[in-house]
């Protein structure tokens, strides 16, 4: 499969600033301070442990890209927790999340292997105008189910 599949239910947020790692590490279920180019799966939980959002965090040289459920209040919650932290939160509203099972490098803006399971292919973050992605996510959902990766209910 050489095409990409659009995941319209996912959104992107860029977090930059000197305290970006400590800010995220106090809120998320996993340590996201890793090497540039590494991705990590994490979750935002309530104090009681209820799942609010599942996220993928990708470390770039000067920011962390966070992929989260588009219909969640993840970005709003992060703004609420920001207070005096030396971080900037930027919604990447003109970007899209796609997935590809082709390991051939592309001209995509950001591309990395899904850290949860190799069967889930490669995540691609790019400006929405740069892609003609397929909207049939059946192949992705089949791979997700085969890898026993749950999906959020609609």
PLM features: what roles do these ranges have?
Residues 1-154:
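Basic, glycine/lysine-rich polyanion-binding surfaces/domains
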């Amino acid at each position: 499969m050489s095409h990409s599949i659009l995941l319209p239910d996912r959104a992107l947020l860029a977090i930059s600033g000197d305290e970006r790692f400590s800010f995220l590490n106090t809120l998320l279920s996993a340590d996201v301070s890793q090497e540039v180019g590494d991705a990590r799966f994490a979750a935002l939980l309530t104090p009681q442990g209820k799942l609010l959002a599942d996220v993928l965090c990708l470390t770039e040289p000067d920011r962390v890209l966070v992929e989260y459920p588009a219909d969640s209040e993840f970005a709003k919650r992060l703004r609420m927790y920001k207070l005096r932290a030396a971080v900037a939160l930027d919604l990447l509203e003109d970007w899209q999340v796609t997935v590809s099972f082709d390991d051939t490098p592309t001209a995509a803006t950001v591309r990395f292997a899904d850290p949860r399971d190799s069967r889930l292919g490669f995540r691609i973050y790019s400006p929405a105008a740069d892609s003609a992605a397929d909207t049939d996510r059946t192949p992705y959902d089949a791979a997700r189910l085969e890898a026993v990766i749950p999906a959020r209910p609609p």
